[in-house]
Amino acid sequence: MAHVVTDLDSTASPERVIHALTDFSSRRLELWPNIDPTTYKLESTEPTSAEVTEGSASFGGVWERSHYDWSRSGTVRIDVQDSNTFEPGSYWLYEVTPLPNGGSHVHMEFDRRPRNFKGQMLSALLTVAGKPVFQKSLGETLKRIEASA
């Protein structure tokens, strides 16, 4: 199992960060460049939830169908429903809070339970090297959000 936690600050407001996490338009691929456009599909959407298939071309292709829930203010939880690599119950958690002088603090948790050999290998890799990878990726996305004002 891989469990990675990281925290970053942004000049973007919490509302803008939450909006970027829950924006399933074509703009999503611009803000989150690690999403492989060939796997991205919005399955369904409700006022505070969505079913989405997304993935990455890395490691021969990793995809997951996930349930997004942003019904709790400042929080987006993404629960894996199906994946070619990880078990259902794996998740992402984003908690976004305002900073005293403007901007936001983003707390991210990534938890993966391997489904197969590929998942075991990725979990081992992410356990060792996941934090800097996710910090860099999230940092790049936050810069894109800040620049899109």
Set out the residue ranges of the language-model regions.
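Hydrophobic ligand-binding cavity/cleft-lining segments
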Residues: M1-P47
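Intrinsic-disorder/low-complexity, polar/charged segments enriched in Ser/Thr/Lys/Arg/Asp/Glu/Gln
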Residues: M1-D7, S49-E51, T75, Y91, ...
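Beta-strand/loop substructures that line and gate deep hydrophobic ligand-binding cavities in soluble
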Residues: V80-K136
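A short, structured loop/turn motif at beta-sheet edges
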Residues: T11-E15, T45-E46, D69-S73, E95-H105
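Hydrophobic pocket/interface hotspot
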Residues: V17-L21, I78, V106-M108
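Glycine-rich portal/gate segments that line the openings of hydrophobic small-molecule binding cavities
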Residues: L29, T38-T85, E140-R144, S148
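Short amphipathic alpha-helical signal-transduction/dimerization elements
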Residues: S25, G130, F134, L138-A149
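Short solvent-exposed loop/turn micro-motifs enriched in small/polar/acidic residues
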Residues: M1, I35, G60-G61, E87-G89
